[in-house]
């Protein structure tokens, strides 16, 4: 099989169907919210971003930035691994404990994204519950459809 030709053809199909993903380069300078800089080739243009997960612009709040810098200086960057090997820190555990407490639950588990949370949940339920049927419609999050 000519894999190069096969995958080139598949990529072209995605492009023709409008399903090929092009990632937009967007930089969000501090004190510019909700405006941002979008790079299109060599050109930069101002855009407004209302689709990020940083709804309240907390990532640019001075206290959040200061605490982030403080934590980076204490423990460095990155978890060192996935959660199931060496990537669970006391910070993860403390956050999960606080989330469980706030929501009056026994435990909580944080995920890197809503997508991974949804995928993990559906996969686990489907594997553990015999004959489970999952119904979804176009109003659900894209990761559930």
Regions found by a protein language model. Give the residues of each.
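Short glycine/serine/threonine-rich phosphate/pyrophosphate-binding segments
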Residues: 110, 115-121, 142-144
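Conserved PLP-anchoring active-site segment centered on the Schiff-base-forming lysine
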Residues: 121-142
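N-terminal "arm"/small-domain region of PLP-dependent enzymes with the aminotransferase-like
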Residues: 2, 13-75
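Conserved N-terminal alpha-helix of the aminotransferase class I/II PLP-enzyme fold
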Residues: 66-113
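Histidine-centered active-site/metal-ligand motif
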Residues: 61, 92, 141
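Short coil/turn connectors at secondary-structure junctions
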Residues: 44, 104-106, 129-132
């Amino acid at each position: 099989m000519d894999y190069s030709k096969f995958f080139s053809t598949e990529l072209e199909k995605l492009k023709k169907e409008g399903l090929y993903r092009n990632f937009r380069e967007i930089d969000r300078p501090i004190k510019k919210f909700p405006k941002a800089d979008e790079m299109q080739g060599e050109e930069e243009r101002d855009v407004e971003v209302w689709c990020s997960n940083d709804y309240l612009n907390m990532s640019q709040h001075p206290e959040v930035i200061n605490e982030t810098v403080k934590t980076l200086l204490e423990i460095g960057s990155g978890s060192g691994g996935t959660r199931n090997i060496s990537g669970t820190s006391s910070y993860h555990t403390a956050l999960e404990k606080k989330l469980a407490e706030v929501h009056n639950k026994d435990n909580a588990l944080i995920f890197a994204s809503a997508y991974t949370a949804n995928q993990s949940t559906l996969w686990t339920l489907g594997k553990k519950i015999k004959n489970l049927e999952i119904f979804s419609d176009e109003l659900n999050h894209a990761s559930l459809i």
